[in-house]
Amino acid sequence: MTMIQFNSYHQKVEIKRNLELMNLEHKKIREYVNFDVCSFEQLDEFQVGYSIDTDGNSLVTDEEDTWDANWIVIAYETMCGDPIIIDLSEEGYPISSLMHGMDSWSGGDFLADSMESFINFMKDIGDFLTEKQVLEGKRMILTKELDILLNEFLERNKFTDFEIWLSLLSPLFDIAEEYEQTMERKVKKMKEEGKKITEIAHMLNIKPKEVYEYIKKV
C-alpha cells in the first residue's frame, strides 16, 4: 500500500490506471527514449530523496523553491537522473521534468499538459516506430519525420519545451542522423559515378526529390 496521500480514492485509482497505461506504452518504445517510468507499486520508492527521506520522513517544507507536497515522481530521465513528476493539484495531472540545483527545485521543463496527453504521445511514437518498421530492425527514418511527430505534439501542448523533448528522444534522432549521413555518402558516390537522379532514386528506393536534397547537402 502506497504512503502517498492522494486527494481521494478516485484520484488514486486514476493515477494507478494512468501509470499502467504509461508503462504499457513505454515498454514498446523504451529503447528509443531517454526516460524510464515507475509502476504504481514503485511510487513510494521513487519519492525517496524528494518528498521523503530513506526512513519515510517528510522532506516537504514551507520554504520557497522547495519540494511541493503535490509533486509525485513517476519517472526519471535516464541521462542525468532528473525526476519527472505529476502535479496532483492540477487538472489532468500535468507532467514536468525538474532539475535540482543550489538547494532549489525552481528549475525545470514542462513536458505535457496531462498524463493522458503524455500517454497518447508515447502511443504516437510507438505507432511511428511500427509504421517505419524500426521495431523490426529497419533504421530508415528522417529527422524531418521526427520533427513533424514532435511538433504535432507541441501544438497540442502549448507550453511544452522543444529542447527537452529533443533530449528525451535523442536515441531516435541519432538513428535518423546516422541514416541520413549514410544516404548522403551513397548519393555522393553514385553522383560521382555519373548516375542520374532518377537512377539513384530507383537504386536507393527513395523519391527523386529526396535524392536532390541529399545532393544539395553534399
Go through the PLM ranges and name each one.
Residues 1-90, 192-193, 197-203, 207-209, ...:
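A surface-exposed partner-binding patch
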Residues 76, 82, 116-124, 189:
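Short, hydrophobic/amphipathic alpha-helical patches that form generic packing surfaces
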Residues 94-133:
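Compact, glycine/acidic-enriched structural inserts
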Residues 118-169:
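Extended, acidic-biased charged interface segments
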Residues 163-183:
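Short, Lys/Arg-enriched anionic-surface-contact patches
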Residues 178-195:
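Short, amphipathic alpha-helical "recognition" segments used to contact nucleic acids or chromatin
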